[in-house]
Structures are given as C-alpha cells and as structure tokens.
Amino acid sequence: MNIYEQLQAVEDRYEELGELLSDPDVVSDTKRFMELSKEEASTRDTVTAYREYKQVLQNIVDAEEMIKESGGDADLEEMAKQELKDAKAEKEEYEEKLKILLLPKDPNDDKNIILEIRGAAGGDEAQLFAGDLLQMYQKYAESQGWRFEVMEASYNGVGGIKEVVAMVSGQSVYSKLKYESGAHRVQRVPVTESQGRVHTSTATVLVMPEIEEVEYDIDPKDLRVDIYHASGAGGQNVNKVATAVRIVHLPTNIKVEMQEERTQQKNRDKAMKIIRARVADHFAQIAQDEQDAERKSTIGTGDRSERIRTYNFPQNRVTDHRIGLTLQKLDTILAGKLDEVVDALVLYDQTQKLEELNK
C-alpha cells in the first residue's frame, strides 16, 4: 500500500467513525463511544491535512489549465504561472507533513504521566537542583493547562528534594515529556560554596505513562501490602489510625510507600497507580533492551542513567546532548518555557523515524 492508498484508507475510516458516533447503539455504549471518539480524534489532523492536500492538487490542475487557456493574455498567464509555482511548493510541504502524520503513533502519547525526580550525585546541591527541576515542570505544566499533583515527596534539611513523585494530567502529556527521562547535570556555584567554585551535580528524572488497571493487570498474589502509622517530622507518628500504605511487587521487589493522604484507601489507590506504572515500565524497559534495532531509532540509548542535558548557570546555557541542541536561555527554560526544547526533540524523533522508514 503506497502513501496515497494509506491516506485514503485513513479518510474512509474517519468517515465511517463519524457515522458510528451518531449511531444510537454506540452512543448508549459509553465505553465503545469513548474508544471510537478517541480513534476519530487521533486521525482528525491526518484527514484534515489530506483533504487540504487534495485541494492543492486540484489547484495545480486548475493553474495548468488556465495557462493553456490564457489565449495570449500575458497578465493572465503570469498570474496562472505564479499560482502554479505556489501550489507546487505547497504540495511538497504537505507531502512531508503527511509522511510525519502517517508515522506509527506511540500508543502512550495521549496518556497522563507519573514523574519521578531524585537528587543523585552531589549531595545537598543535587537535591536543591532536583527542586529546581520540579518547579520547571510545574510551571511548564501550568503553561500547557495540565494538572500537576505532587503525590509523594521527601525533602532534605536545606529545602532540596531527595525524591518526589508527581502525577501530571492533561492532553498529550506523555508525548511532550517522554524525552525527559535520564540524568540532568547542573554546573553552578552552590550557595554553600565560599570560594566561588563551580560544582557539578546530577538529578535524575523518570517519566512513565499512567497505566490503567484494565491495561495492565497485576496479580494480587504478587503484591504484599503493609499498613502502618504515618510519620511526621522527627519520625513521630501523626495518626492514631494506621493510614500509611506500603506495597511491594514481590517478583521485581519494586516498592511504593504512600502516606500523603488522610485515609488508608486514598493512599492505597495512589500507591497502586505508581506501582502499576513502575512495574509496567520495568518490563517495557527489559523488552526495549532486547530490541537493539528499535533502540537505535529512538533518542539516546534508552539508558536511564544516560546524561541527557546539562544546565550551565555561569554561561546561562542549556545543552541537550542527544540532539546537539544548545540554548543560551537557562533562566527562561528553568522558568518553565520548555517549548523550544520539547519541539526540537519531537522533530528529531520524527526525522529519525522517517529515515528508518525510508531505508
């Protein structure tokens, strides 16, 4: 099937979906209606671009016809030639756009994410930088109209973050933040440095798609659930009723503890969201490691410890090492203006996939 047959098939399916979504039997079946609505929405951009492309092809035919029928009218012929030139340029642009729209979609792109940030090498300074990254993602989420909820956080004595787990919810969150997983390195003079020397520290970021229970079923026999009293500052028990929850996935020894909420059930629900995402991510990473050819076509190696980005404060510079992008905009990027970085990563990924497709 060539690209035009693929596009026609997508348009035919889109029109079929439109009819199905107006069928009373489908409307009354909430689950099916939502599935079909999601499928229709996922193909809308492709169909719109394809229809515009077909109009451009018609414009080329019309312009060529006008040139033939100009009958010696120099002005009319000149106008038709300009229209033909413009339409041919548009045709090339649409063909590139349509190739990208037909690339295989990441099934997780529309999902919410669970975001984990940890201070790594560098002690207090690494944990302070982890806090800076948390604020950066919070501000970016706000600019995108997403909901950002801190689910669990552990702080050090100087205001830094040892570890934080957050849920980011909204439209296409994973598609934009999936490239953030990896080691983020910072170069700056710590507030505790009296000699003015630049130190290098690292924080790690992990982005996982939220996995619904119906998508990934964990056998209850593989889980150990412990209930205990939530503790406050200094380790004292703050609740008379045991509300804190610890869940361990026995086959992988992945563990989640949750005590942020006031009730045991809410802590359990949040812990299950996180452990489902971590376990699914664990096995997805194993599968990815086994697919060397596929890994070559993704940004970076896929190694979670891979250094992906450096934030150099003295030079106000951010460098993304995977795509060779350098921006002298560290202050604005840490203020949540991540669009330029995200767009460059998305474009690079699309380019790599197109090259794979054309081999």
UniProtKB/Swiss-Prot annotation:
GO terms for molecular function: translation release factor activity, codon specific. Keywords: Cytoplasm, Methylation, Protein biosynthesis. It comes from the Bacteria. SMART domains: PCRF. InterPro entries: PCRF, Pep_chain_release_fac_I, Pep_chain_release_fac_I_sf, Prokaryotic/Mito_RF, RF-1. Residues 288-307 are annotated as: Disordered. It is found in: Cytoplasm. It holds the Pfam family PCRF. Signal peptide: none annotated. GO terms for cellular component: cytoplasm. The modification N5-methylglutamine is found at residue 236. Residues 293-307 have a biased composition (Basic and acidic residues). Methylated by PrmC. Methylation increases the termination efficiency of RF1. Belongs to the prokaryotic/mitochondrial release factor family. PANTHER family: LD18447P. Peptide chain release factor 1 directs the termination of translation in response to the peptide chain termination codons UAG and UAA. This is Peptide chain release factor 1. It comes from Streptococcus gordonii (strain Challis / ATCC 35105 / BCRC 15272 / CH1 / DL1 / V288). The gene is prfA.
